[in-house]
Amino acid sequence: LEGLEQVYVETNQINDYLAYTKTLNKINMQAATSEDSLVYVTAELQYMMGNYEQAAAGLTTYLTSFCPGGRYCMTAQYYAANSYYRLKQYDAAIDQYSALADMAGNPYMEEACIRVAELSYDKKEYRTSLYYFQRLQEVASSSSIRTTAMLGILRCSQNIGDKTSVIETASSLLAVNSLAED
């Protein structure tokens, strides 16, 4: 049965395999407990092979079926977001990266904030972009990422007409640059 499972995983037909195992009463319990892992691993394999359309579909199925509470929700969310981004389906990517940025304890937080901020900016959704640049500034792990966030805040503030924020952010950027030169 393990060999059969592997074939179904590699051919991206995990739903057929799960339906088959449910017809076998003896292993029905085992299939139910491993369904989370099988659905994820199948979608992850598609992602790793660069089949982003199939990966996005499989990961979305996983997220809908098992999250919150699934074993792989955070990584699945990241792979789904990245798949949509690579497919240039930016609205879906924004949705997935936003959901990822809302997850606590997230090792992908910086990338999620950068992606949502930049994609929103490109769509001229400056308030959304501003929000994610501000979040990026809070979680930045390096001074260069903090500077990127501040530049984003400056641009968004300019576009929404928030002169106070423009002045404050520009002053902060100048202070950071003068410290860097020292």
List each model region and its residues:
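Acidic, polar-rich low-complexity tracts and alpha-helical solenoid repeat scaffolds
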Residues: 1-182
